[in-house]
Amino acid sequence: ERLNRGKVDVEDFKRFRLQQGIYGQRQDDVQMVRTKLSTGRMTTDQLLCLSDFADRYSNGILHVTTRQDFQFHFVKLEDVSKGLQDLADYGLTTREACGNTVRNVTACHKAGTCKEEIFDVAPYGKAVTNYLIRHAVTQNLPRKFKISFGGCSGCGLAPIHDIGLNAQIRNKD
């Protein structure tokens, strides 16, 4: 509303919008909304909430991203605020899913179930997310920054991230 009344600078709004996980689209008056699902994990209720968001505010399609998130296209600008509140009601956020921030922390898609994993890395990914989200240092980076956790030697994603961590257990000797 404040943007439409000229009370907010367009560049300030763009920076704020990106930090909130919202991209403008080429089409007028619609946005792309991206969630931030730490390590790609969610509950059944959260998945149902995402499905409801797609039906209510988007075009009914949940796009799965390479960072283990979902994004929704064609969300009307006037629906974004209510949609974000609906997500928050289920413990979901879009905060820092876009822009020059620490992007979603990913983990091996088999974390917690892989027979070859050294240990489940998902709790470590979630801890890093919880520490970094809304942290002053991560709000205005020169570029997006990506972190990934792998639980076994077969996890191939760690080497292609800014920080890639693979599980290891070392003896103290």
Regions found by a protein language model. Name each.
Residues E1-Q27, Q139:
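Acidic/polar, glycine-rich intrinsically disordered N-terminal extensions of enzymes
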Residues N4-V8, V30-K172:
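Small-residue-enriched alpha-helical segments and adjacent helix-cap loops
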